Every structure is written in C-alpha cells, then in structure tokens.
C-alpha cells in the first residue's frame, strides 16, 4: 500500500487520558513526522497536531484507537498526492 502525507488533529477534553494518548502515539511513532501540543487551559482542553506519513490502514488504526478514548476527538486528512508523485 502507498504511503501518503497527512495531518491528524487531536482534541483532549479529559486530561486524565493524556498518558494513554501518549502511549498510543508512541506506538505509532514511526509514522509521525512532527508533533505539536498546545494546552488550552482557558478553554478546558488540549490540542495535539501531527504531521504523518503512512498508509490509509495505518492512519485508520491510529485514529481508531485514539477515537475510542473517552474525552478525545480526532480528525485526519490525507493529501491527494501519493508519495511517489512528490518530487524531491
């Protein structure tokens, strides 16, 4: 299966689940190119954004595991351009 570049946005409203989110992200570390976390304490949640490179199956597995956690919302997007079409 072809790898594609994409993004994942994670909104965490229950901070007690953060260790589990970090464990899942660590399990998928090979596909994570960049990660940015922003605490939004004044709004009562935290946001993590990821830039990833992986197959659609890998992305589905990652977002599925995160999305099943109480207090976590996940949205993802993959570029239409496939990896071999990207010029170096």
What kind of region is each of these model predictions?
Residues 1-88:
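Long, contiguous binding/interaction regions
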């Amino acid at each position: 299966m072809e790898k594609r570049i994409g993004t994942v946005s994670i909104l965490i409203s229950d901070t007690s689940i953060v260790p589990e989110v970090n464990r899942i992200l660590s399990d998928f570390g090979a596909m994570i190119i960049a990660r940015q976390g922003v605490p939004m304490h004044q709004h009562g949640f935290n946001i993590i954004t990821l830039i990833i490179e992986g197959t659609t199956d890998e992305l589905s597995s990652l977002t599925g595991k995160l999305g099943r956690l109480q207090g976590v919302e996940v949205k993802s997007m993959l570029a239409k351009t496939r990896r071999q079409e990207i010029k170096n």
